[in-house]
């Protein structure tokens, strides 16, 4: 399985994480996994009411939830925001 290392910012809890993402998973599934992981890492402090979106930090553009990581511009070192 191919993976990329990204830097994830979560502004609501003012935290950042370095996370490996599998390139064959859809962005929608990645968001679900990231939400669960951040919730656990923040000891339950991060609990979004609705499904968050994933954005590219540099371009501020949201990612299409229907494509895979491989089909997006997410590469090693990409900085993402989970809002």
Question: Positions of the model-derived regions?
Answer:
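Ubiquitin system architectures
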Residues: 2-83
């Amino acid at each position: 399985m191919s993976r990329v290392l990204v830097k994830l910012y979560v502004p609501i809890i003012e935290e950042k994480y370095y996370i490996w993402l599998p390139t064959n998973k859809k962005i929608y599934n990645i968001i679900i996994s990231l939400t669960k992981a951040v919730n656990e890492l923040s000891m339950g402090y991060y609990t979004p009411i609705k499904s968050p979106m994933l954005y590219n930090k540099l371009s501020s553009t949201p990612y299409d939830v229907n494509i895979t990581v491989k089909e997006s511009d997410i590469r090693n070192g990409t900085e993402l925001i989970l809002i």
